[in-house]
Amino acid sequence: MGKTDYFERKLDDKRRLTIPTELRDELKSGVVITRGFGQYLHMYPKQVWDEMVEPKLDGDILDERIADLNVQFRTGKTEVELDDKQGRVTIEQHLLAYASIDRDIVVVGVGRYWRVMAK
């Protein structure tokens, strides 16, 4: 992960989150945003999603635990591109509603991904 493991932001009127400059290279391959396990979101670099999360979701289709993870992570999952000019990503309204996020947010690094939460 980059140097920044915590930041606070206000979403703009178009639901865009500005990413700190030092994290933008890590997210240039794209961003996957999905529901977390609690009332927050997960934000993954696309490469991390493809290499680490997606393979875990492709387990035994009869394994109830894997099925539950698929429902949790795929419900509302969005893939977005980082805006090159301003370094922003747009968060879909249904994900904001799930996490009870209005405008003020906190983003915390958790290993290779970030938790996005209401402030």
Protein language model annotation of sequence segments:
Residues 1-9, 13-14, 22-86, 93-119:
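Flexible "stalk/tail and boundary" regions
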